[in-house]
């Protein structure tokens, strides 16, 4: 498999880098999203109890100690208590947008890899075919299948590699956006 991969030529280097980056981004984001999604079933009950008791400081402290996007939204809302309801809602919405942006960090890299890797693979296809025809022209009238095979190998290997990397990145991206 390594020998076949090496026949893809220099185009395989960016494809390898994109695949490593896509795998890293997928697992890093998957881990971050899972961590953010962990819910403490008693969190809201304790917040409500603190608020009903008038202990706003304890409610805010609980939010600050609970490292989740949900807790940060609640904390922002609590910090705006006593202000007009629209101010509270806008503050929570802004915090929600910030939290979503944090969770979606590096998603564009996966989307770009999903779209770009096949294009890079097709670039390898074109360069491989150019090489095959160049070799055939250099051989003159004595060209045989071995003269063409190096370029054709490069063309096919880079096409497959680009498609594989792109497809994996696309599925990884789509999986993450549905979590």
Each language-model region and where it sits:
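Alpha-helical transmembrane segments of integral membrane proteins
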Residues: 12-25, 111-118, 165-169
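Predominantly long cytosolic amphipathic alpha-helical stalk/bundle segments
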Residues: 37-123, 127-141, 171-179
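Channel- or pocket-lining gating/hinge segments that regulate access to a cavity or pore
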Residues: 144-179
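Loop-to-transmembrane-helix entry motif
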Residues: 7-12, 99, 103-117, 151-162
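Hydrophobic membrane-targeting segments
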Residues: 1-42, 176
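Residue-level micro-sites within transmembrane alpha helices that shape
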Residues: 18-21, 27-28, 117-120, 127, ...
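Residue-level signature of catalytic and energy-coupling elements of molecular machines
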Residues: 9, 23, 59, 74, ...
């Amino acid at each position: 498999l390594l020998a076949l991969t090496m026949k893809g030529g220099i185009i395989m280097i960016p494809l390898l880098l994109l695949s490593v980056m896509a795998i890293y981004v997928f697992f890093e984001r998957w881990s971050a999203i899972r961590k953010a999604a962990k819910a403490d079933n008693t969190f809201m009950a304790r917040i409500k109890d603190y608020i009903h008791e008038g202990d706003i400081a304890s409610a805010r402290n609980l939010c600050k100690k609970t490292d989740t996007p949900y807790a940060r939204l609640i904390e922002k809302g609590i910090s705006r208590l006593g202000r007009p309801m629209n101010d509270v809602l806008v503050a929570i919405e802004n915090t929600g947008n910030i939290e979503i942006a944090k969770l979606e960090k590096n998603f564009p890299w996966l989307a770009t890899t999903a779209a770009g890797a096949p294009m890079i693979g097709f670039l390898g296809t074109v360069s491989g075919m150019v090489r095959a025809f160049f070799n055939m022209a250099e051989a003159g009238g004595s060209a045989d299948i071995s003269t063409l095979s190096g370029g054709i190998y490069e063309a096919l290997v880079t096409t497959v590699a680009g498609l594989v990397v792109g497809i994996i990145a696309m599925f990884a991206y789509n999986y993450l956006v549905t979590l």
